[in-house]
Amino acid sequence: MMIKMSISRLLFCSSLFLSGISVFAQELPYKQPNLPIEERVNDLLSRMTLEEKVTQIRHIHSWNIFNGQTLDTEKLKAFSKGMSWGFVEGFPLTGANCRKNMQLVQKFMVENTRLGIPVFTVAESLHGSVHEGSVIYPQNVALGSTFSPELAYRKAAMITKDLHAQGMHQVLAPCIDVVRDLRWGRVEESFGEDPILCGLFGIAEVKGYMDNGISPMLKHYGPHGNPLSGLNLASVECGLRDLHEVYLKPFEMVIRNTSVLAVMSTYNSWNRIPNSASHYLLTEVLRNQFGFKGYVYSDWGAIEMLKTLHYTAHNSEEAAMQAFT
């Protein structure tokens, strides 16, 4: 009887303790969905260490945490070091395995990190989700030749069905580069050579994604479609008039006509100044002139290339600082 009574008291006290933890967690402003977003964000930022803030603007690559088609929880635990990361992709995953694995990563981040911040799941989708089993659509250069932005809207809206089924929040599209050199190896990713056409198609695709619950990302910000000798990583050489009336015009159009919140900067350069470390492009033009309020996401390897390709940084730390331009 005494043992039963002790167990009953223990369970009762434990329930009070756990409910107290639950109430405390719910009282944290950043976890209360009924509060204004800005208030929740400010509260969360006030609780974060510098390292946690830095980790929020970093990306987990699939090779960091997956073994083939399976999430390696031990790898994820060692890699994350108790902190939630900003973004994760699973490009090698098939469509059938994608959602399950993304949910496992999300569950880990929410339950096994200090602040429980969810991660943003990211997919590539220039003309259909990159994951095996997804519907593939015509490349942008073919879509642009129809001169029908409505088709771009419908295409993006259809792609979101696959993205939702795969557990994705964000797509690395649309590509609105203006092509002016057919030797460039990425011509098919563009809607064409006309900046207004690229802008109109970009607006349509962004709305197609956003109207259906997926966050799009404009790319590639900075002159990109006319590199020297047609080489992908080479500098684009042009004056201010061509910069603004040709290469940046589609970005200005989309930013002014939609509520897009993500832009990807290129890994090449404009007049030999790296686009991903250009104060003029990223701050003076993108934010101050175009009024962009979202975040800039560097293209694959762009920050490291400040050290290995552009030679503007002596090491990775200096390269990262240059990106905060």
Residue ranges and their predicted role:
Residues 1-27:
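Bacterial Sec-dependent N-terminal signal peptides
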Residues 25-325:
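Glycoside hydrolase catalytic-domain context in secreted enzymes
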